[in-house]
């Protein structure tokens, strides 16, 4: 067979492959159009039981106790997908529950010491607090487990009559006749990687609402669809993201300083790549150790994970962790675009909440 024949055969095969994919797509579309799902109607459907979604549900119930509100959480329980040992400014919580202390909110470790360092490979320079912007002052804040805070918020929401369904991943959006968002498909199982339906397929159900709030967190799959469909990012800067890695350590009691908050920049990233670290001393000899690397680095060989490992070998950090035990770890994307990257949050039938809308106050690191 000559080269000309090979090219013809290759082109024929590619053409057949395209037609097969088109046919498969048509068959899949037909299958999906024939699926019948049960529906449940609410006044408000909220996707995501993070702090934004739960706070929205609570505030709506406080304003009108007759509203039917459901919160859908993909994790096995509320807080299962929350990855943030955080310093919490309680001002937002005060607006929801002025009596949060009497309600035993899990804010038990006030910030007692606030440090900021510029690191070199073998040493560090502490920046005086007086030189730091007021927004970075953590006086009056608390070191918390956001997972515990979300579980507590869920308890308060349920006490007000909010329905919370855990283990309910939302896979699809439901639109109304006028193009408005009407609801979501939740609890769908048994789709293969190419979208085809397996024998174990469960269609899930449609949860419909007069309003649908998306609080999925950073780069949520449904939020991205809504931003594109309604052109919510028109006129905005391109959003920026970082990769945040966090570990929980149990350290030697002699090295533990409950209430201490430390942030740093510099080594190992240097100043050509942006990012930095945090170390928060919780109670029970536990310490949150984390590192954030902005994902705009130009060096293709840079590994955020390895930069985090190098950071832990800095003399100051290694001394803290010596003899300690890592008890949990994880990583998560972080929105870092700033106000100029915020999309419009309202759209026909709903709104974006929290990190789905990029609502992170970077100067506050909150």
Predicted regions span which residues?
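Conserved Rossmann-like nucleotide-cofactor binding loop
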Residues: 52, 77, 219
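FAD/FMN-dependent oxidoreductases across multiple families
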Residues: 273, 299, 304-366
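Predominantly flavin-linked oxidoreductase catalytic cores and closely associated redox partners
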Residues: 156-316
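Short, positively charged and aromatic/hydrophobic N-terminal segments
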Residues: 16, 21-27
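N-terminal FAD cofactor-binding segment of flavoenzymes
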Residues: 74-123
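Short beta-strand to alpha-helix junction loop
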Residues: 136-155, 165, 298-303
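N-terminal Rossmann-like FAD-binding beta1-loop-alpha1 element of flavoenzymes
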Residues: 44-70
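A short, basic/flexible loop-to-alpha-helix module at the beginning of a structural domain
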Residues: 26-41, 195-204
